[in-house]
Structure formats: structure tokens, C-alpha cells
Amino acid sequence: MKGQIMKEYKFTASTIYKLNEKLKKKPFKYIYKELMPNFLFDKIQREVYFSNQKAIVSDWDKILADYFKDKIEIAKVIPKKKFLNDEKIIWQFWGQGWDYENLPNVVKICYRAMNKYRENYTLIRLDMENIGEYLEFPDYVMKKLSEKKMGYAHFTDILRFSLLKYYGGVWIDATILLTDYLPSEYFKMDYFLFQRDGDFKNKKEFELYDSIYFSWNKKSKIKMLSSIIFSHKDNKIMATLLDLLLVFWRDNDKIPNYFFMQILYTELVEKYYKKDRCKIVSDTLPHELFKVWFETYSKEKLKKITDSVSIHKLSFKIDSSKKKVENTFFEYFKNLYEI
């Protein structure tokens, strides 16, 4: 289009972040990390983390400024299927394939719970073998994935926003556990995802639980959970996130921060799409169950959690062999779903 430019948008880590990474390695780490009091080291790491987020915000803002002036040529994802306009679809992805016996136990639990609570929604489980039936990605996306410059986690960002833009429905990570049917109110919204609630009371509890993801510090720009997203077809926030991730991966071979997409979302809804932002429901809610996953099972505690939310973000990355499993919430769900 007229006025569009071919320009590279490179992301760079902050100077403080680069220095910090150097100091954490030999030979400096013996002085920097080992001899420094833990509280001081942790405080420095938080400030470095915020500094790097600030640098990422600056890089995203450069792209956003050109994007909203229609100055960027963007590669397209091509949809391959057609669905009925009123068809409600649940999308899931597991790159290694859905052979049940090969799934991690946590994913097996979520798999069976999804089958139980899918209701009358069309459930489409994707893997690397069948995504081509639904979407055609730009060559550079698949090339960077095959060369392992892009990991599955960040390829999944492109996949989820492509599916939601072109088909709509609800994206649900393979590690999302349902304990009831999906709330119908979320399907009625133009889009919905869980976000950071500034009025949440037990902030310290969650910052101690996961200091990388959870923070209510004003410097933090990571404020959304992408593991479950409801969206109507052609939602402009989903479309914009997809466009800008395609620009990022066109010009970059590595991520500046694991949550760089979440930082982009914050910039979009706080600066460009304020009126279009979905209502804020605390992203602590889907984490409540996994926070106690390896604790002693309590029927009362489970009821309290599931009364407040039916959508739970789990993880298969924690080595359960190193955790107490007997009589835990984990064991309860394993037994419930006969795993």
C-alpha cells in the first residue's frame, strides 16, 4: 500500500540487562551472586527485569507508531477452512502430537477434563501434522520454527491469534484444566482473557508464588494470561497482536523476554485500544489451583477454588518425581480421571 516501508524492527535488551547477564557468569558470579546477600541480589534482579521490560516497551512503541500510520508491510496468514458463522470452536495445540499415551500426566488430566466439559462446542486439537489444514503461515515463520530460532511457546502465540482472528472461538492451552463448563458470558464478549487486577488484595502471596509473572509494581508491563482467550472472529485486538508478532519474527531471531507478547498487549490496551479492552477479571484466579497442586488435598479448599473459577492454569514442567504426590490435589485429579 502507498506509504508502506520495508524497515527492520530489531529488539535489543537494555544495557543494564546485558551487564547483569555478564555478571551472573564466571568469573564474576562468585562476587556478584555468591557473596551478595540474597535480599539485595533479588532486589537488583527485579530492577533489571523492569529495565528490560522498559526497553521492550520502547521497541514495541516504534513498531506501533508506524503500524497505526499504515507504514508497515505485513505478511499474511491464510485461512484454509470455512465454518458456520454460529459454530463455537475450542482450539487446542500440542506440537508433539495428541497420542494420549505419550502425553505428560498433567496434560492427560486436562485432556480428559476437556472431553467432559466441552459441552456442544466443536473441539479441534491441532499438532504440527494438521495445522496446515487450517492455516498457511509465511515461510519465514515455519523456517524459524524448524531452525529452533522460535520455540513452540512463541509459535503458539502466532497460532492462537491466527485462529481467533480468522475463525473465532476459544483458545485453550493443553495445560488448562476445566472443573465445570466454560462461562457463557465470556463467549458473548467481543473478546475475553484474564488480566492483572490492580485492586487484588493478596498481592504479596502471588508475587512470592511466581515473581517472574506476577507483579503489581507500576514498572511491570506483564499483565495478561494468554493461556485461555475467547474471541469473536475478526476482533481487532487479536488481529493487531497477530500482525505485530509477524513483524517481530520477520526481523528477529530470538526473544527479548519470555513475556514480550504480554508486554505488547499491555501497550495496545493502555495506549491504543482503551475503549475496546475487555473487562478485567483477575489473572490470579486461574492460578489458585496449581498454587496448591502439590499440597495435601482438601475437599473444602478445592470447593472454594472451583466456586470462584472453573478454568485452571496448570504446568507440566514441574518435575512431579521431586514433589510429594501422595494425597495431594495432583493425586486427586489423577485418580478422578483414572490416570
Predicted regions and their residues:
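Glycosyltransferase-associated regions of secretory-pathway enzymes
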Residues: 2-156, 174-339
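Active-site acidic Asp-centered loop
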Residues: 167, 172-173
